[in-house]
């Protein structure tokens, strides 16, 4: 039944919210995988730059460059959205996550590390506002705060903890190259899940719409 004007929107539990928006569940999974890669690469950055033959000074410069480039990306996000859909921006940032960690994996000099750090503009700089806009556009008004909280838990909580723990264990056993290969796998999986979440594959998009409609009818 249509909602009466002035009526308070229905506030769902976490489980109800995830059932109602199955594509949002995929977005959460993509966020967790991508942030597992991003957070662990920041945590163990000193090992990455040492692999490239540098030290803590170069690490600080690379991290500063990456952090500096996040701000203009966030500031220009609204202009980007005028040219590209939100779905394409999410795919772009997922691709940047993968490209950056692949360059880290292959890097043999600090030049490559610095070039990879430039990708932070398209990576985390777009990721943060894009996920906020996704919730605003796809989650009903009464549950947007809960949606934002779930994204924070999936990315900064589950993803970061999973990535740091696994990469720490792999670093001890397989070295920096093994750790970076694991991060590449996480980023690649995150890209695939992001494509599914944003409806890139038509057959999957149709199935998601059917699931969402069934969930709405059951609430």
Positions of the model-derived regions?
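Juxtamembrane intracellular "pre-TM" segments in multi-pass secondary transporters
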Residues: 1-28, 218
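Helix-loop junctions at membrane interfaces in 12-TM secondary transporters
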Residues: 105-116
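Helix-to-loop junctions at the C-terminal end of transmembrane segments
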Residues: 72-86, 171-172
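Intracellular juxtamembrane helix-capping segments at the cytosolic ends
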Residues: 126-140
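Pair of pore-lining "gating" transmembrane helices in MFS-fold secondary transporters
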Residues: 19-41, 118-122
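Structural signature of the two symmetry-related core transmembrane helices
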Residues: 88-103, 184
